[in-house]
UniProtKB/Swiss-Prot annotation:
PANTHER family: 4-HYDROXYBENZOATE POLYPRENYLTRANSFERASE, MITOCHONDRIAL, PRENYLTRANSFERASES. The chain crosses the membrane at residues 27-47, 50-70, 101-121, 142-162, 179-199, 239-259, 285-305. HAMAP family: UbiA. It is an enzyme of class 2 (transferase). This is 4-hydroxybenzoate octaprenyltransferase. Its EC number is 2.5.1.39.
Length: 307
């Protein structure tokens, strides 16, 4: 008699949780990290100190991971109809809804504990930041461009970085916000929102056929045949906003080199998405964090030369 085939062991809870928070896909939290750290350096006029660097780096990773838990719970009925997401732990039933929410809550509380080591204004800003992050998955049901909601969520680290550096007097009202977060910091937020629109529209282009069938809204569907043109316009607005503000703040040659490196990558991304292939669009999205890194590196080097 032939031996019965050995049954594969089910994945451990730790393995499932790692899948839930996309631990093997750091591109997601890197997309949040570079603009947040860029704002931190600009707010401080250079190196912001190890404490704030640790708070915002760890906080970014934790909140992005918590966001994955919330997103997978909210989208579980949709995800089973999408090729790319059908095997996510919550969608396939390997992790329960309550379990995923518990993991997300623990991660969010850990991030909040880090925020508590900053100041009152930054703590206050963390609440609307959380609200927007929670709202994003549900925006896909009723907003034509839900990527704009994601753009606000992914950009909220910018005003929080300024408040952490400049809002240390204990006040947390509107006057304190205006004093700690200048108008040009909000300009950085708006510019970064356009970057999010660019790369998340590329991401939405991957799933467009599936999304049309299940009836959710995305920027790729809303933009239709103008999607590639719109993505390139979003990139240009992002680089224009950050470039104008950076030069206005006195950044020079190194920052210009960072912008140029980012622009070269954007031009390459156009070659990846112009035919709207799934593989090309997904590759452009997956490598997009290098665009943000180029801008961040230009800021760091330029401010470092001043020191």
């Amino acid at each position: 008699m032939s031996a019965a085939p050995a049954q594969a062991h089910p994945p451990s809870r730790l393995t499932l949780y790692r899948q839930l928070i996309r631990w093997d896909r750091p591109a997601g939290w890197l997309l949040l990290l570079w603009p947040t750290l860029g704002a931190l350096w600009l707010a401080a006029g250079g190196f912001p100190g190890w404490h704030l660097l640790a708070v915002f780096t760890l906080g970014t990773v934790l909140m992005r991971s918590a966001g994955c838990c919330i997103n997978d719970v909210a989208d579980r009925e949709f995800d089973r109809h999408v090729k790319r997401t059908a095997e996510r732990p919550v969608t396939r039933g390997a992790v329960s809804v309550k379990e995923a929410l518990a993991v997300g809550a623990v991660l969010a509380l850990a991030a909040f504990a880090l925020v508590l080591t900053t100041n009152a204004l930054t703590i206050a800003l963390s609440f609307p930041a959380l609200a927007v992050a929670v709202a994003y998955p549900y925006a896909k049901r009723c907003v034509a461009m839900p990527q704009a909601v994601l753009g606000v969520a992914f950009s909220f680290g910018i005003p929080m970085a300024f408040s952490a550096v400049r809002g240390g007097n204990g006040a947390w009202g509107l006057a304190a916000l205006n004093a700690a977060v200048p108008w040009w910091a909000w300009g950085l937020l708006i510019g970064n929102l356009f970057w999010v629109l660019a790369y998340d529209t590329e991401y939405a282009m991957v799933d467009r056929d599936d999304d049309l069938k299940i009836g959710i809204k995305t920027s790729a569907i809303t933009l239709g045949r103008h999607d590639v043109t719109a993505v390139m316009s979003f990139y240009q607005l992002y680089l224009l906003a950050w470039g104008a503000i950076g030069f206005w703040q006195g950044l020079g040659v190194a920052f210009a080199a960072g912008l140029a490196a980012a622009a070269v990558q954007v031009a390459w991304h156009h070659t990846l998405i112009r035919d709207r292939s799934r593989d090309g669009c997904f590759k452009a999205f997956r490598l997009n964090h290098w665009v943000g890194f180029a801008v961040f590196a230009g800021i760091v080097v330029d401010l470092g030369w001043r020191a």
